[in-house]
């Protein structure tokens, strides 16, 4: 297709998903949230675009959030082109792509949602660990929070340290 920016890739993906849904005998009102990151290691730059899912990155021990376009890949009332964000990064920057499953998980002492603020605080607190250690600590925190409650959604967290 010759699309090179995350925003244009998400635009084309949305077009293809809608086209596919329209071929169905029944009306499909579904979509997906996506976060797409392209890494240019030589120029220390990333390009990112998101459909409902933000990008978080930790640089100099500060968590920075880049907000996503508030629209899914799929049919939506107001279709706008997806924005591509270009970010220059320093060595030892960690990027996080994730679904809403961890933040939406019920648990803890009061059976409440984990929430994004708590998720951010967790990521900052474990930032000095290796990515493998971070993975284990996130999983442990999730299980300790959830305890015996049912998992409510898929949980996917991708961390990339550059």
Residues covered by each model-derived region:
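Conserved subregion of the PPM/PP2C metallophosphatase catalytic domain
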Residues: 1-162
